[in-house]
A protein has these predicted regions:
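Conserved short histidine dyad/triad with adjacent acidic residue
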Residues: 6, 19-36
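Ligand-binding loop in jelly-roll beta-barrel domains
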Residues: 70-97
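Short histidine-centered beta-strand/loop micro-motifs
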Residues: 10-12, 30-36, 77-79
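Short acidic-glycine-tyrosine-enriched beta hairpin
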Residues: 55-70
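Short strand-coil-strand connectors
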Residues: 16, 52-56
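Short, conserved beta-strand element in jelly-roll/cupin
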Residues: 35-51
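A generic "binding-loop/recognition-motif" signal
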Residues: 27, 37, 56, 72-73, ...
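Extreme N-terminal tail/first-helix region
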Residues: 1-13
Length: 97
């Protein structure tokens, strides 16, 4: 299992115009039915996670980036038996048409 380089990821997201935050969730934790005005990125660092986006389930592996588009209904679940750690970032640079 490859470890996620937190500092490298944070710097990469900053370059791409995203914020950076960390969640550590207990087994069974559910963040249900969220919608944001901006795009979001999620990367699992430890444990297991399920990300449901507009009714479609994704099970990213550690280090795999998951994109959640702006205005998409989404739910995040810790599906494992241990705490998980995941990084999230919101698009901070506004793009104009």
């Amino acid at each position: 299992m490859e470890k996620v380089d937190k500092l490298k990821l944070k710097n990469d997201w900053k370059q791409r115009g995203y914020s950076f935050g960390v969640f550590r969730d207990p087994p069974g934790q559910v963040w249900a039915n969220f919608v944001h005005k901006t795009d979001e990125l999620v990367v699992l660092a430890e444990g297991e996670i399920q990300i449901e986006i507009e009714g479609r389930s994704h099970f990213p592996k550690i280090g795999e980036e998951q994109f959640i588009p702006a205005k998409a209904l989404h739910t995040v679940r810790n599906t494992g038996r241990t705490y998980n750690v995941w990084y999230y970032g919101y698009k901070t640079i506004l793009e104009f048409d």
